């Protein structure tokens, strides 16, 4: 396994997923679900999923996700965009599932919270490029640890209300 390739593949989804939280600092936020409920009577995604967060996640993931490739040339801008946008989509899917399971916003849901963004990013990206299975397995192993650590840092920085 080429560790440089591995880390440059997981970097855009990590950045996209981690940077969307900065939208919480904005004064005006617009929920992706417009405050509407699904057919089960519960919110579709919840207040924590906003258009601003989606835009920040995709833009930051694409730009910062591509940036190291100016040196290493592993993925292109399109690749960084696909990985970032699909990571944000995966996070939305995770929020949708959590709402269906009656979990409130911020409630921990292992391994859904830790892997939804990454597995969706890899699934969508694999429609365009081949991803070695060993990369997916390695990412599944290390992501929960990295996710927990970065969430704790975001909590300490008061970007998140919960440390998970």
Swiss-Prot record:
GO terms for molecular function: CDP-2,3-bis-(O-geranylgeranyl)-sn-glycerol synthase activity. Pathway: Membrane lipid metabolism; glycerophospholipid metabolism. It is found in: Cell membrane. The chain crosses the membrane at residues 3-23, 55-75, 77-97, 122-142. It is a multi-pass membrane protein. One of its GO terms (cellular component) is plasma membrane. Its EC number is 2.7.7.67. NCBIfam families: PRK04032.1 (NF003114). Catalyzes the formation of CDP-2,3-bis-(O-geranylgeranyl)-sn-glycerol (CDP-archaeol) from 2,3-bis-(O-geranylgeranyl)-sn-glycerol 1-phosphate (DGGGP) and CTP. This reaction is the third ether-bond-formation step in the biosynthesis of archaeal membrane lipids. Belongs to the CDP-archaeol synthase family. This is CDP-archaeol synthase. The gene is carS.
